[in-house]
Amino acid sequence: MKAHEETNMLESMVVLIDTREQPTERAKKRYEALEAPYERRTLSYGDYSYNAQLPNGKWLFEDGETVSGYAVVERKMHLDELASCLTHSRDRFEREFQRAKDHGARIFLLVENATWENLLAGRYRSQFNEKAFFASLCAWLVRYDLQLVFCKEETSGKIIKELLYRDLKERITRGEFDEGR
């Protein structure tokens, strides 16, 4: 891919937001913080992914198509929600991560308002024992090759966009989309 084609592809990037993400006031602030075009689409897994226009004019994912992204961000509001996903909703959560892994997607698990220190100290609302929570999360990081990101909710939009942009840039650099010329 030529340099100008790479630039055009990166500039065409649109952040995809899963239709199941509720458009709350907090979410709207996150969308604004993306500082990038975005659209709501049905994602096979994850809460955020991306689309981009190939040099031949086609998009990675066509309108109406359920998106199985190359990279996804699974966002959780806090440790409480993550604890619930690893206990009460574990089967559903596991199926979603397995689908992403089977598809070869890069998975970022982003947890707002969280730190390792808060997890290890049990500073969250759940009966999930902190040692079990820690062990379970570490096992998931290894099992699904997850990249874990803790951040404040104010910065999550910016981080989501940058992670997706960098994944797209890396794939372009490696030539993964060269056949779409």
Where on the chain are the PLM-derived regions?
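Non-catalytic C-terminal interaction segments of nucleic acid-processing enzymes
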Residues: 1-68, 80-181
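Conserved catalytic cores of phosphodiester-cleaving nucleases, focusing on short active-site segments
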Residues: 71-77
